[in-house]
Curated annotation (Swiss-Prot):
Residue numbers bearing the Phosphothreonine modification: 359
Modified residues annotated as N-acetylserine in this record: 2
Principal cellular location given in the protein's record: cytoplasm
Organism: Saccharomyces cerevisiae (strain ATCC 204508 / S288c)
EC top class, as a word: ligase
Name of the protein in its database record: Tyrosine--tRNA ligase, cytoplasmic
Amino acid sequence: MSSAATVDPNEAFGLITKNLQEVLNPQIIKDVLEVQKRHLKLYWGTAPTGRPHCGYFVPMTKLADFLKAGCEVTVLLADLHAFLDNMKAPLEVVNYRAKYYELTIKAILRSINVPIEKLKFVVGSSYQLTPDYTMDIFRLSNIVSQNDAKRAGADVVKQVANPLLSGLIYPLMQALDEQFLDVDCQFGGVDQRKIFVLAEENLPSLGYKKRAHLMNPMVPGLAQGGKMSASDPNSKIDLLEEPKQVKKKINSAFCSPGNVEENGLLSFVQYVIAPIQELKFGTNHFEFFIDRPEKFGGPITYKSFEEMKLAFKEEKLSPPDLKIGVADAINELLEPIRQEFANNKEFQEASEKGYPVATPQKSKKAKKPKNKGTKYPGATKTNEIATKLEETKL
């Protein structure tokens, strides 16, 4: 892996900003690379809530670009954020989930041939409970209004009818993490934009420098509309999903003929398959094979994403055929991760204890007393019952 000393600043900047949807304050990055002539320090944070899904391949390909550009990359396992987000991760399981996320991220990166020796993992609670951090939370809460905090977390924190106060603390902590992790830049999905702006606008008021922000596009979910989400099982494909289940989910995914705008499958090819192929085989390499049945024209290989996208738009590539290719490609990506999980006891324990399967409680039906009539000894006479019922009437 190249270091900043051997990577040309322009080449490094190109790698850092490649395939991103938006960059805030790019001049900060250029100043570090061209003027200060040092490694760019950045972090990517993830809250260990639901099980990671295939959408995580998008930030993983960017971590690969950052490392190739010589960046010092920190992965923040934001355990307290997971707890604060409407208690998506209860405290008794959050430590196991953080470990599960760490092992999953390492497995993904290894599966796409990315060296991870220079990757640093930090658990949020290791510094977020210190006196200095706590005091800065108080200082920041004395600057940021309730409305600003709520708006900042609107696209990230789970929205409910009666929101908890924790949802307002969440974006303040994410802003402060930039200072306490000592970075020049924070990377995240475009859904984080409002939190990034909150950090830019308010950290200088505490005497801290403004950071740059990098945003990747969000991979659409399998259903129509919405993003792939760890907390919505119907929108995602789990990284440990069995091959048959992957095909079943892909076959039921929304995919309208000729529609290239609202197409989660094409987006997955564009933002996951294509970048991974470039990582493995070099720049501009693209080869997408579809094992199409002979009666529909036989197998076909596309040599560029644009060619494939145009074929779908012109309805030369049908939704069923696209689904065949995407399901096969996903299963090929997931196989080494499944294998690593199967051979790693620590990985399995983190999964078992982080995501315990609730055992349904069998409720015993209350036995109804049999009506034995009025003949058996001690039975209440029918006319006596009628009298008592009459007495209870208001």
